[in-house]
């Protein structure tokens, strides 16, 4: 259950950024979660709600954006590998054009706080 540690890191990151910007309240947080992280967005959202209780984050809206896997293959294919082509227990990715495994993953591994909307002190 690596969702708990990731949710904790997200909460700490957001609280730190909010405090550095003199926030009195965090209104909204947008988080990008790559498909290759194998993080469950519903579990992340639940844990974010639980971990934010009693903090400046309590009551904030969490927007979780799932980032699809994008590759650059040696065959020349550049694009998204559809989610239904992934085995969620042991992700094996292959190029949809040539079936090969020699490629660079451009997106889908990230777990980033993309945006934080705060209310500042008057």
UniProtKB/Swiss-Prot annotation:
Sorted UniProt keywords: Metal-binding, Nickel, Zinc
Molecular function via GO: nickel cation binding; zinc ion binding
Disulfide bonds listed in the record: none
Listed Pfam families: HypA
InterPro entries, alphabetized: Hydgase_Ni_incorp_HypA/HybF_CS (IPR020538), HypA/HybF (IPR000688)
Binding site for Zn(2+): 73, 75, 95, 98
Binding site for Ni(2+): 2
Gene Ontology BP annotations: protein maturation; protein modification process
Domain of life: Archaea
Keyword match Zinc: yes
Family statement drawn from the similarity comment of this UniProt entry: Belongs to the HypA/HybF family.
Role played: Involved in the maturation of [NiFe] hydrogenases. Required for nickel insertion into the metal center of the hydrogenase.
The protein's name in its UniProt record: Hydrogenase maturation factor HypA
Natural source organism: Methanothermobacter thermautotrophicus (strain ATCC 29096 / DSM 1053 / JCM 10044 / NBRC 100330 / Delta H) (Methanobacterium thermoautotrophicum)
Originating gene: hypA
């Amino acid at each position: 259950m690596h969702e708990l540690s990731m949710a904790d890191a997200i909460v700490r990151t957001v609280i730190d950024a909010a405090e550095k910007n003199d926030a009195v309240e965090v209104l909204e947080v947008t988080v990008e979660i790559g498909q290759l992280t194998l993080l469950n967005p519903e579990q992340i959202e639940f844990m974010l709600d639980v971990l934010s209780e009693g903090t400046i984050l309590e009551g904030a809206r969490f927007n979780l954006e799932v980032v699809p896997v994008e590759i650059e293959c040696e065959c020349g294919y550049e694009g998204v590998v559809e989610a239904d082509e992934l085995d969620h227990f042991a992700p094996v990715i292959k190029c949809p054009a040539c079936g090969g495994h020699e490629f660079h993953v451009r997106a889908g591994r990230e777990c980033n706080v993309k945006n934080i909307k705060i209310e500042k002190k008057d």
